[in-house]
Amino acid sequence: NLLTVEGLFAGYDGQPVLRDLTFDVPKGALIALIGPNGHGKTTLMRCIAGLLKPTTGKVEFSGKKVTGLPAEEMVSRGVVLIPQGDMLFPDMSVVDNLRMGAFLPAARAKFSENVEEIYGMLPRLKERSSQMARTLSGGERRMLAIGRGLLSGGAILLLDEPSLGLAPIVIH
């Protein structure tokens, strides 16, 4: 399995959000977490990405225990989180924002080739490549955040509210 979560408990300020969560994600799988607001989807992704330390339980990634490792260590292992908010660099161009996604050496070496692939999937980004990120529409900013995440070359991509602000044609 690429990811194993076992007996995970997590929450905020003593308030539990996740209770005894257990599941596996095989390599190559596409998994969707569906549920009402406030039921732990973001909390789970934050635990996996190293942004929130679980109260108890275990997270394994590529067969290695990674529970509680810091976010920078998780990124270096190939775990990429695209949060609900844009988290873009507003005063940088679209292409420079995309370049920031390819900060690991292996991704950086293939940036020119991979950015063309992103432009093929999200052609609006190519049209706007020299524009500052702050000038983009909400949907374009979401496309940019997703494109930047894809350029990281991570082994697993965690998208929080992936279709938020996107036009239906882009989602399909």
Locate the predicted segments by residue.
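ABC-type ATPase nucleotide-binding domains, specifically the catalytic core motifs of the NBD
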Residues: 13, 31, 69, 94-113, ...
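The feature captures the beta-strand-to-loop junction immediately N-terminal to the Walker
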Residues: 34-36
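Helix-to-loop junction immediately C-terminal to a conserved catalytic motif
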Residues: 49
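Conserved ABC transporter NBD signature motif
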Residues: 57-65, 77, 110-115
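Short coil-to-helix segment of the ABC ATPase nucleotide-binding domain corresponding to the Q-loop/switch region
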Residues: 91-99, 129, 159, 169
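Conserved ABC ATPase signature
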Residues: 132-136, 140
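A short, proline-enriched helix->beta-strand linker immediately N-terminal to the Walker B motif
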Residues: 150-155, 161
